[in-house]
Design a protein with these regions (language model features):
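Solvent-exposed, non-transmembrane regions of membrane-associated and secreted proteins
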Residues: 1-158
Length: 158
């Protein structure tokens, strides 16, 4: 049972109080260049802009935001190419659990710590489900493995 009005989630009889964060729209995040944010993982040198839609058009300029996922709160899902002419997620394969991910937007910056790095099926979208916290999920292809995707997931730290 969820009670979003009081910004808490009820689960198994206990209440987990979530920090109140107003809902965010695309217009709140849209920059003059069309991007909605910037994702970076300094340890591996990954830094790229984020555009709405996990489309070839978006991923030719940076990372593509999965439209059904959170924009700033919840589970923010990002897709990107790692080879070819636009390898914005090329360094994702070097990420390790514990690395820090930053997501900078017009309304603020969130900082996350990587909790999962692994290969998932290209049909497995469960890592983009809402988990009751703020997290970011980055997904890219794996070279010569067309049925797999590399998934990096990080949970917000404050």
């Amino acid at each position: 049972e969820s009670d979003f009005g009081s910004s808490s989630i009820i689960s198994d009889g206990g209440t987990i109080v979530m920090p109140y964060e107003p809902s965010v729209t695309l217009n709140d995040l849209k920059q003059s260049d069309g991007s909605i944010g910037q994702v970076s993982i300094d340890r591996v040198g990954l830094n790229c802009k984020v555009y709405e839609g996990a489309t070839d058009s978006s991923m030719s300029k940076g990372a593509g935001h999965y439209s059904s996922s959170g924009l700033y709160t919840g589970n923010v899902g990002l897709f990107g190419h790692n080879r070819g002419n636009h390898p914005y997620f090329g360094k994702l394969k070097n990420v390790k659990v514990g690395d820090i991910v930053k997501y900078k937007t017009a309304i603020g910056t969130k900082t996350y710590k990587v909790t999962f790095v692994g290969a998932i099926s290209y049909t497995d979208f469960s890592y983009l489900n809402e988990m009751g916290d703020n997290r970011i999920t980055l997904i890219t292809c794996i070279a010569n493995q067309p049925s797999l995707r590399l998934c990096v997931q990080a949970v917000e730290i404050r």
